[in-house]
């Protein structure tokens, strides 16, 4: 995969990446539906361990997203924050500043109850900053998607 055109804007520092992950609230998940792209916005949680990013998503127990992941687990994701539009004297001077993360990964549907409980706790911590605990019965009403990031 090619890198960014504006390489001076690329973020490599793990602490900066974590700041973006903590500030953002919506991840755009890119999937493949046959020969068509399909993107869905989702809440997420993450674990950064030894420089490796693992992302957890949750959703309904059935639907298009799960069908697509089962057919092709290769995914692309994007999330952004700090969106600030700016103006100029001419049209070409208008723009937006933002921070974002994009990457590829392999998605898997989590079946293990303990990992599902962990994923839900991580997701809620990322979204709210609060700690929550989940009982086994709560894990049965949602599907957890785990993205093992590749970059």
Language-model segment annotations:
Residues 20-21, 68-69, 123:
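A generic structural signal for nonpolar/aromatic side chains embedded in well-ordered alpha-helices
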Residues 11-13, 23-28, 127-130:
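Short Pro/Gly-enriched beta-strand edge/turn motifs at strand-loop
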Residues 29, 75-79:
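Short conserved beta-strand and strand-loop elements enriched in small hydrophobics
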Residues 1-22:
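Extreme N-terminal tail/first-helix region
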Residues 32, 43, 60-62, 80-82, ...:
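Histidine- and/or cysteine-centered catalytic micro-motif in compact active-site loops
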Residues 53-75:
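Compact nucleic-acid interaction/catalytic patches
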Residues 24-61:
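Short beta-strand segments
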Residues 2-6, 83-151:
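Charged, gly/pro-rich active-site loop segments
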């Amino acid at each position: 995969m090619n890198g960014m055109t504006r390489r001076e804007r690329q973020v490599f520092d793990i602490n900066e990446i974590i700041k973006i992950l903590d500030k953002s609230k919506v991840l755009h998940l890119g999937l493949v539906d046959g020969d068509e792209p399909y993107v869905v916005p989702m809440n997420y949680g993450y674990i950064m361990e030894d420089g490796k990013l693992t992302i957890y998503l949750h959703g309904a127990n059935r639907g298009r997203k799960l069908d697509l992941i089962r057919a092709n687990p290769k995914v692309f994701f994007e999330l952004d924050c700090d969106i600030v539009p700016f103006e100029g004297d001419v049209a070409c001077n208008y723009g937006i500043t933002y921070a974002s993360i994009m990457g590829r990964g392999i998605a898997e549907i989590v079946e293990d109850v303990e990992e599902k409980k962990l994923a839900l706790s991580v997701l809620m911590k990322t979204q709210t900053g609060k700690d929550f605990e989940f009982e086994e019965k709560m894990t049965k009403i949602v599907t957890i998607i785990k993205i093992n990031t590749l970059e």
